[in-house]
């Protein structure tokens, strides 16, 4: 009779350990997949992320926003000419060089507006180069060996009794569900960043039209700061992901499985919070408003 109970006990333990291993394998697999997904998504340029959206944004910018930017240039250049002429002793000390300077500013303003997309895409090409370099350094050191991690836990699982294994099954199931929710939030953050980039690029001719004016130029300067901040945000996201993966990799070796499971959940929440804050941090670095 006792041998039958022992056999049933071992059978139940095997089922529970199998469920725990399945949950842990899914969680660690999700970590590896999410690290790779974030690196791939952040490293894409606006052209590479979705060609159809990029084409639509470019057409809107060239056909709708550029004419408005032309009106802005006209106003800015007229204001600039009036200011340049009148500031010299009410037109008594007018120098012909002023007109040369005005024509040069007009040329630069028109050039910037007509080449807006080339300039904005150059910013994100540079950002892609930085992110790709970071992904090469970070990605090679953060991949978790799922098989090795599970093998290291097997002895500890076999020593546990059924109640503790049941508790661990519930914990791993709960944390696995939380990981799925966090994964959705991370996807929302990444897609939200790209949509913000497209929206930012769509109106780029207007701030570029103001850059040659001393007073209005702050609009264009702040726009450029924001543009660089959006590009640099990808690098900050890669740093957050790298730190997260290293923390998870060290957590796998923890002796207490219960604390390790909830540490994984805590690290994932911290990752989401860090990704949310990466945009504000990038803007503060570039002093963009």
Regions from the language model: what does each represent?
Residues 81-94, 183-187, 215-216:
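Membrane-water interface regions at transmembrane-helix termini and the short interhelical loops
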Residues 1-72, 88-97, 107-178, 217, ...:
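Gly/Ser-rich, low-complexity
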Residues 75, 120-123, 127, 185-188, ...:
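Membrane-embedded alpha-helices of multi-pass transport/permease systems
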Residues 175, 179-211, 225-246:
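Alpha-helical transmembrane segments of helical membrane proteins, especially in multi-pass transport
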């Amino acid at each position: 009779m006792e041998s039958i109970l022992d056999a049933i006990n071992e059978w139940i333990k095997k089922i529970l350990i199998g469920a725990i291993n399945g949950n842990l394998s899914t969680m660690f697999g999700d970590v590896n997949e999410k690290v790779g997904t974030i690196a791939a998504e952040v490293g894409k340029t606006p052209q590479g992320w979705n060609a159809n959206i990029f084409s639509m944004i470019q057409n809107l910018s060239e056909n709708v926003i550029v004419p408005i930017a032309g009106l802005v240039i006209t106003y800015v250049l007229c204001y600039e000419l009036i200011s340049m002429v009148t500031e010299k002793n009410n037109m008594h000390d007018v120098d012909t060089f002023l007109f040369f300077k005005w024509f040069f500013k007009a040329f630069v303003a028109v050039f910037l507006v007509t080449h807006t997309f080339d300039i904005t895409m150059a910013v994100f090409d540079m950002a892609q180069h930085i992110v790709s370099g970071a992904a090469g350094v970070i990605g090679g050191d953060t991949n978790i060996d799922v098989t090795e991690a599970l093998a290291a836990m097997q002895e500890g699982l076999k020593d546990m009794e059924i109640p503790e294994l049941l508790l661990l099954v519930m914990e791993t199931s709960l944390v696995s569900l939380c990981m799925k929710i966090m994964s959705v939030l991370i996807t929302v953050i990444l897609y939200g960043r790209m949509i913000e980039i497209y929206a930012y690029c769509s109106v780029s001719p207007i701030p570029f039209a103001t850059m040659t004016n001393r007073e209005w130029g702050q609009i264009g300067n702040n726009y450029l700061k924001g543009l660089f901040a959006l590009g640099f945000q990808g690098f900050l996201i890669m740093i957050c992901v790298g730190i997260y993966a290293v923390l998870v990799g060290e957590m796998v070796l923890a002796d207490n499985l219960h604390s390790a499971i909830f540490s994984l959940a805590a690290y994932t929440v911290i990752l989401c919070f860090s990704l949310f804050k990466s945009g504000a941090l990038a803007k503060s670095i570039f002093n963009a408003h």
